[in-house]
């Protein structure tokens, strides 16, 4: 996805919106100022996605997955709404949404039979924020389908 592959990006976006629909999450997507973040309303089970985030950034799919994560985390809503300005930056709630989004995109990747064996390649291919690299390594290790030489770990 980091490569300019709009068809693949659009397929992932479609998957994520279908996932939201299947989980009773309403969504609004809009184009606004590139600096206006996406947000979620937990009580209403609704996400609002700025499709012009950083001028149509390849990270838009991760933004969608992240906002879905806010709704799906099952925790009591302590805020009126969740507004994400910087992935992995604010608090545990933002971090949990990042992790949910990472796992959701990984689930999609597996369904596509992408067969990533390197977490860094997965992150890059799906334009996931590099702040998620440590969590991606942990996720790959937990999944037991680890095959990367960088740290001398090889699992099959």
Where on the chain are the PLM-derived regions?
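Active-site hotspot residues in diverse enzymes, especially metal/ion-binding acidic/histidine motifs
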Residues: 1-156
């Amino acid at each position: 996805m980091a490569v300019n592959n709009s068809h693949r990006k659009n397929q992932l976006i479609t998957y994520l919106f279908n996932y939201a629909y299947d989980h009773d999450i309403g969504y609004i997507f809009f184009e606004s100022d590139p600096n206006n973040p996406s947000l979620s309303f937990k009580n209403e089970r609704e996400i609002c996605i700025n499709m012009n985030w950083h001028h149509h950034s390849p990270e838009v799919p991760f933004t969608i997955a992240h906002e879905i994560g806010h709704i799906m985390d099952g925790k009591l809503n302590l805020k009126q709404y969740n507004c994400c300005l910087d992935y992995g930056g604010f608090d545990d709630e933002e971090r949990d949404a990042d992790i949910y989004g990472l796992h959701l995109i990984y689930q999609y990747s597996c369904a596509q039979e992408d067969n990533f064996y390197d977490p860094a390649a997965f992150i890059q291919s799906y334009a996931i924020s590099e702040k998620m690299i440590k969590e991606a390594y942990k996720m790959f290790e937990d999944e037991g389908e680890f095959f990367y030489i960088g740290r001398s770990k090889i699992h099959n």
